[in-house]
């Protein structure tokens, strides 16, 4: 099961030197994220603003209940950055169009967010918007329907520390984050294809 309102945004930019950088927030060495181990992502869902705030990233490892869904939906966003201030967030679903119903595993998304938070990958986003050092994280949405059936959706989270949650500037940053996710994903896919061609 995937969220509604799938939206694919394109970008000509591609990440450079994937897998050759140093440590990122969250305990991941991007050099450990070997190309063949990185997940394939072809589509990125429009950012979903979460009606939640956290006192700091240290409080985001536990599920938080959304009031907008009659207490049937919770989120764990697993943020980790260099700011100990309040934050709000967007949930961004991702999937591979060849198998859109397949759930992307949390460890795969954790590796992917390490690439996204790499300083060189983040450079353009940080120049255009006021963001912290590691705004991306691997997140989970938990749902429980009227019959008590539970489901989960793993995705990516983009969090923000701005003083006016979900303002125009905040949304612009989230949309740029969505485009960055797709750009990096396409760069990984292209690099994998080149690698396969070189092995022939």
From Swiss-Prot:
GO terms for biological process: viral life cycle. It comes from Equine herpesvirus 1 (strain Ab4p) (EHV-1). Residues 1-23 are annotated as: Disordered. Signal peptide: none annotated. Belongs to the alphaherpesvirinae HHV-1 UL55 family. Keywords: Host nucleus, Virion, Virion tegument. This is Tegument protein UL55 homolog. It comes from the Viruses. GO terms for cellular component: host cell nuclear matrix; viral tegument. It holds the Pfam family Herpes_UL55. Residues 1-20 have a biased composition (Basic and acidic residues). The keyword Magnesium does not apply. It is found in: Virion tegument; Host nucleus matrix.
């Amino acid at each position: 099961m995937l969220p509604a309102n799938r939206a694919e945004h394109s970008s000509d930019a591609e990440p450079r030197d994937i897998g050759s950088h140093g440590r990122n927030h969250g305990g991941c060495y991007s050099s450990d994220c070997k190309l063949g181990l990185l997940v394939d992502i072809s589509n990125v869902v429009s950012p979903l603003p979460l009606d939640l705030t956290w006192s700091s990233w240290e409080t985001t490892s536990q599920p938080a209940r959304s009031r907008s869904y009659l207490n049937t939906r919770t989120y764990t966003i697993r943020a980790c950055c260099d700011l100990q201030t309040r934050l709000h967030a967007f949930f961004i679903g991702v999937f591979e169009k060849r198998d859109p119903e397949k759930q992307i595993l949390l460890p795969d998304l954790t590796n992917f967010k390490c690439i996204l938070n790499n300083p060189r990958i983040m450079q353009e986003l940080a120049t255009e918007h006021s963001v912290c050092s590691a705004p991306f994280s691997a997140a989970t949405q938990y749902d429980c329907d009227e019959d008590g059936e539970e489901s989960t959706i793993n995705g990516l989270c983009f969090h923000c520390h701005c003083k006016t949650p979900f303002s125009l500037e905040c949304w612009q940053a989230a949309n740029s984050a969505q485009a960055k996710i797709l750009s990096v994903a396409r760069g990984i896919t292209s690099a994998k294809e080149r690698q396969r061609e070189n092995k022939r």
